[in-house]
Amino acid sequence: MAGNQGNYREKPTRNEKNYKKANGQPRLKEKSSRAKSDNVCPYAKKCGGCDYQGVEYKEQLKTKQAYMKKLLKPFCFVEPIVGMKNPLYYRHKVHAAFDCTRRGQIVAGAYRKNTHDVVDIESCMIEEQESDEIIKDIKDMLRSFRIKTYDEDTGYGLLRHVLVRKGYATGQIMVVLVLASPILPSKNNFVKALRKKHPNITTVVLNVNDKKTSMVLGDRNITLYGKGFIEDKLCGCTFRISPSSFYQVNPVQTELLYEKAIHEAHLTGKERVIDAYCGTGTIGIIAAKNAGEVIGVELNRDAIRDAVTNAKRNDIRNIRFYNDDAGKFMVEMAQKGEKADVVIMDPPRTGSDEAFLSSVVKLSPERVVYVSCGPETLARDLKYLTKHGYAVKRATPYDCFPYTEHIETVVLLCR
């Protein structure tokens, strides 16, 4: 989902549950036989975040496989979906909204479906456990430090959200306190008390969001402890993660997903590769180890800065990044008579658009590797590409978000 890096567009529930199917497609859970599972969350009815609550994991995979097979039947063979050995506690980015009830109880958790009412959640079955414990302890610390939660209606109060990000390979932890003001009373003592409870915390950042907005993060970050970022390793490379950086929430499946994407590119060390919607450069940097040259293109300026930093951090010298619209960039390449052997595209859930897809056709790479997080928009985009000279060779679904309807897919297209 490299096109979604940067700030949040709206206040999400903990697993981005409000994803709606396009074109009237039936919801996946309606296709499931709903075989019962012992993994039933006590907050399920209030939160509504997990579409497959109480459904055995094997049944979830079976349902998703059948759905993708039917959806992509006009285009190609669909390989067996790649699931997880342990589908619990996989989210390494945890967001909690904070509020105070009419009775004065401080609550922290997810928004109730289709509302801004906060469901108080102490432990979520799909979230990294230490992150949940940190959020719980922050909630318990607020009264002793006289920190009030922010009220959306009145604009009164201080703490709006807490974001915890943890590196899967490194174990580094970043805590982001989203406040309505840059002033946190007794900030040094607060950080000291929090680190005493959780000494594994690597950095604490104060993010200032002083606007009446549905965005979670503001534009200004103040580092209270540590470097203001953490690092994690993926496919042998090290990546910097700052408060607003896009970085996949399920590192176990992401590594498998990216390895498949690089494999499908069939790189021999000579190819010129375009990493479109490159985000913070993860796929492109990994691909650069086996390519002749990689060009990363991304519209988000902050993401490009992170991408350049990540390339330097990994001593990757055969990659260049451009802060530009990927479609426009490739059209200009084609007009100049330039070529690319492979295009790797990782668009947001809304998919690509005709302007970008037409630029792919004009540039005419031998192979296109499409990394999708939206099945219906994937099918739509494949329809366009197959009408313009490309053949879909195969598709491999990945279950990066167990207990939800979301499906990621790697697709190979060739001329």
Model-found features: residue ranges?
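Short helix/loop segment immediately N-terminal to the Walker
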Residues: 149-156, 273
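Accessory substrate-recognition/RNA-binding modules or partner subunits associated with SAM-dependent
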Residues: 120-122, 126, 131, 135, ...
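Short, acidic/hydrophobic/Gly-rich beta-strand patch recurrent on exposed beta strands
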Residues: 109-112, 176-178, 307
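Short, aliphatic-rich beta-strand segments
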Residues: 99, 164, 171-180, 238-242, ...
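Extended interfacial segments that mediate partner engagement and assembly in macromolecular machines
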Residues: 35-39, 48-149, 169, 184
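Rossmann-like S-adenosyl-L-methionine
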Residues: 2-31, 186-188, 192-415
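Nucleotide donor/acceptor-binding cores
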Residues: 92, 171-173, 270-271
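Short, solvent-exposed loop/turn elements at beta->coil junctions and helix N-caps
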Residues: 80-87, 152-153, 161, 165, ...
